[in-house]
């Protein structure tokens, strides 16, 4: 069958840069889904996106659907004909609806009877007939939160639509979408190529747009931007800070990237680097630059959408724009330092953390007390921990943080050092928000860990305590992130802390503000649920996680040891048999409603296999006890794995549910003791 390249492009006014890639890939997914659902084969499909368009190119697309045979079953033969063999009205009506005579029908014989049958060949539709509706469907399914109208039209889309291009090879596919008819013309560069560009063949799309100063491939354009930035940075013997989110946004802002470098006054470097960096990135979409040692320098790299004959004019304009931004940061820094962090404590009384839970001042005091409590458990400086907790939210009242919320905590560190606070306290102020996201760094020192954990536990306990736990996708206080962050800090920093203890201490600090009587249980259950996500991201199997969750160990380090032990156990050759045996024992005991003995009675053992199992188990138990005391779960499971052979022999030769009640209970007691030894570590019966 003949194949051709399909091109579909929607040309628009400037699309929101933060949404461009999402829109383009969603359109790609939708078109691909439409092609697949219509049984149209192709070799490859590619997506494109610039500020004023998104498109797909489909290669080696068949020109039409395959023909297919459709079987249409009619009435049963005994209904289709009377005794004389004449066709009934039912048979005639069915035949007429299928465009045949009754005697042209085939017969379908099954085990349930015989029916009339018509096999019809349905011709496949041409691609050019299908594409317009497919495009409309793909556009309607795009994730657009706030569509807009333009002109006198009632059509709605994310931005006004200028062109629609639908080409199959060199043929224009007739149709329209969003009020625009299809053509073979697309928009060139807004400044370098003001007219429309004619695409004579779908294969020419990328090359023709390149002539019109449009690099239409998003990924290729991004690669060019990265290469240009690195080259410019290398030319000034510096290193550019290339943030992925900013890079995506800049790529979505330009069609023909040209990268330049600007300079700002060195005096601005007296301001901490972080607010300067955020000002350059967030406000101006510039890439900050450091020296080879990572120190910010008075340069910035920016990407323009114009290949200018006089780039110095563009550079001067951008230098002029960045100057007042950096001057604002400098002013905030100088002004903020006139007031100590401690003096800002009172102003926290005017800011609510949450209506039922009180102000940020009250939260700071709770964080301080819980931080002190944690520091005492870790044998750290409790006084420093309390001080850091108390000052933890004060920088939120500074002008710098009000202007650049991203530097909260970081500015607290700088202001604390300026106030004469010690290094531990200052660093803890910055560390309190860590980890901010998956893969983020953790607090540097244990004082910072104490404050970070306290802040997170306080939020968890408070919000659960007023019955406002996260529901569905709604998590306004970022409690899921708080739970995972607490887990990460405790495990990765190897802190000997118990979540139940911390939760109960936090509840105590809230006084009578909490109304949920089950706060402690609810918070612990919520955090336990985050363990699943935490370990799944590390590639731990779900059944291993489930096995440990059955024990609900509230100390994360203990949880971690059990996970490692069960993972190790699951790889042993004895694991499958012992898991099955534990499950079998659990099922047997679940059906037994009597009372077991305190211990196995050898006098009631009538079979050699049960005596052998009891003896071996006793010897192994003596080895396991000190291992459990040391929480050496892996070694304990290694010892218990030796029970496989005697357990196999026991089940092969011993009737557990003996007619003799005493013997039966004795055997169940032995099996229960063995099961409990495993369950002291994890529920291995769930392993698969």
From Swiss-Prot:
Any keyword Translocase? no
Which reaction(s) does the protein catalyse, per the Swiss-Prot or TrEMBL entry? tRNA(Gly) + glycine + ATP = glycyl-tRNA(Gly) + AMP + diphosphate
Presence of the UniProt keyword Ligase in the record: yes
InterPro entries on file? DALR_anticod-bd, Gly-tRNA-synth_bsu, Gly-tRNA-synth_heterodimer
Look at the named UniProt entry and state the broad enzyme category this protein falls under.
ligase
Which coarse location class applies to the principal site listed for this UniProt protein?
cytoplasm
Q: Which UniProt keywords apply?
A: Aminoacyl-tRNA synthetase, ATP-binding, Cytoplasm, Ligase, Nucleotide-binding, Protein biosynthesis
Q: What EC number(s) would the UniProt record show?
A: 6.1.1.14
- UniProt cross-references to Pfam families, sorted A to Z: DALR_1 (PF05746), tRNA_synt_2f (PF02092)
The entry's cellular-component GO terms read:
cytosol
Q: Where in the cell is it found?
A: Cytoplasm
Recorded GO molecular functions are: arginine-tRNA ligase activity; ATP binding; glycine-tRNA ligase activity
BP terms from Gene Ontology: arginyl-tRNA aminoacylation; glycyl-tRNA aminoacylation
Assembly and partners? Tetramer of two alpha and two beta subunits.
* HAMAP family xrefs: Gly_tRNA_synth_beta (MF_00255)
Family membership, please give it: Belongs to the class-II aminoacyl-tRNA synthetase family.
Q: What is this protein called?
A: Glycine--tRNA ligase beta subunit
């Amino acid at each position: 069958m003949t194949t051709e390249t399909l091109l579909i492009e929607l040309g628009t006014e400037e699309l929101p840069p933060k949404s461009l890639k999402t829109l383009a890939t969603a359109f790609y997914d939708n078109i691909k889904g439409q092609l697949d659902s219509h049984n149209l084969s192709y070799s490859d499909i590619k997506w494109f996106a610039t500020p004023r368009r998104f498109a797909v190119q489909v290669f080696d697309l068949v020109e039409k659907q395959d023909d297919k045979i459709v079987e249409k079953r009619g009435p049963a033969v005994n209904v289709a004909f009377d005794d004389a063999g004449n066709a009934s009205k039912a048979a005639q009506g069915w035949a007429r609806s299928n465009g045949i005579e009754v005697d042209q029908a085939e017969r379908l014989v099954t085990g349930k009877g015989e029916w009339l049958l018509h096999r019809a060949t349905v011709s496949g539709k041409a691609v050019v007939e299908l594409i317009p509706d497919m495009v409309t469907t793909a556009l309607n399914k795009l994730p657009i939160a706030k569509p807009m109208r333009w002109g006198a039209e009632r059509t709605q889309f994310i931005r006004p639509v200028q062109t629609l291009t639908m080409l199959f090879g060199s043929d224009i596919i007739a149709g329209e979408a969003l009020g625009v008819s299809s053509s073979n013309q697309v928009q060139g560069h807004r400044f370098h190529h003001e007219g429309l560009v004619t695409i004579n063949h779908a294969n020419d799309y990328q090359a023709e747009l390149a002539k019109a100063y449009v690099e239409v491939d998003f990924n290729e354009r991004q690669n060019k931007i990265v290469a240009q930035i690195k080259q410019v940075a290398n030319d000034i013997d510096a290193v550019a800070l290339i943030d992925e989110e900013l890079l995506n946004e800049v790529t979505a802002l330009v069609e023909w990237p040209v990268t330049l470098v600007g300079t700002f006054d060195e005096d601005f470097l007296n301001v901490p680097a972080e607010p300067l960096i955020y000002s350059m990135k967030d406000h101006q979409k510039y890439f900050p630059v450091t020296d080879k040692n990572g120190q910010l320098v008075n340069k910035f790299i920016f990407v323009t959408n114009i290949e200018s004959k006089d780039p110095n004019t563009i550079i001067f304009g951008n230098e002029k724009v960045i100057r007042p931004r950096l001057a604002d940061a400098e002013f905030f820094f100088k002004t903020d330092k006139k007031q100590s962090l401690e003096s800002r404590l009172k102003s926290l009384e005017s800011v609510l953390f949450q209506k039922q839970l009180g102000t940020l001042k009250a939260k700071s005091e709770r964080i301080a007390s819980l931080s002190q409590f944690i520091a005492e458990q870790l044998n750290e400086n409790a006084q420093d921990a309390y001080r850091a907790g108390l000052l933890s939210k004060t920088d939120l009242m500074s002008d710098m943080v009000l202007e650049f919320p991203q530097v909260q905590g970081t500015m607290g560190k700088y202001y604390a050092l300026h106030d004469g606070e010690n290094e531990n306290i200052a660093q803890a102020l910055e560390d309190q928000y860590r980890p901010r996201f998956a893969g983020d760094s953790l607090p540097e020192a244990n004082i910072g860990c104490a404050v970070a954990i306290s802040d997170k536990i306080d939020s968890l306990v408070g919000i659960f305590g007023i019955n406002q736990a996260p529901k569905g996708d709604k998590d306004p206080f970022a409690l899921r992130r708080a739970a995972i962050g607490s887990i990460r800090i405790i495990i990765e920093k190897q802190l000997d802390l118990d979540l139940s203890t911390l939760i109960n201490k936090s509840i105590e600090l809230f006084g009578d503000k909490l109304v949920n009587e089950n706060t402690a249980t609810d918070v612990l259950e919520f955090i336990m649920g985050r363990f699943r996500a935490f370990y799944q991201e590390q590639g731990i199997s779900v059944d291993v996680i489930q096995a440990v969750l059955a024990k609900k160990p509230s100390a994360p380090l203990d949880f971690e040891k059990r996970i490692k032990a069960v993972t190790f156990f699951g790889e042993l050759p004895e694991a499958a048999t012992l898991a099955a045996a534990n499950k079998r024992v659990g099922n047997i005991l679940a059906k037994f409603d009597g009372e077991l003995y305190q211990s196995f009675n050898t006098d009631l053992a009538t079979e050699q296999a049960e005596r052998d199992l009891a003896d071996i188990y006793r010897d192994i138990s003596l080895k396991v006890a000190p291992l459990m005391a040391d929480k050496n779960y892996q070694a304990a499971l290694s010892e218990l794995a030796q029970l496989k052979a005697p357990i196999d022999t026991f089940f092969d030769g011993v009737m557990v549910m003996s007619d003799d009640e005493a013997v039966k209970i004795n055997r169940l007691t032995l099996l229960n003791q063995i099961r409990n030894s495993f369950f002291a570590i994890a529920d291995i019966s769930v392993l698969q």
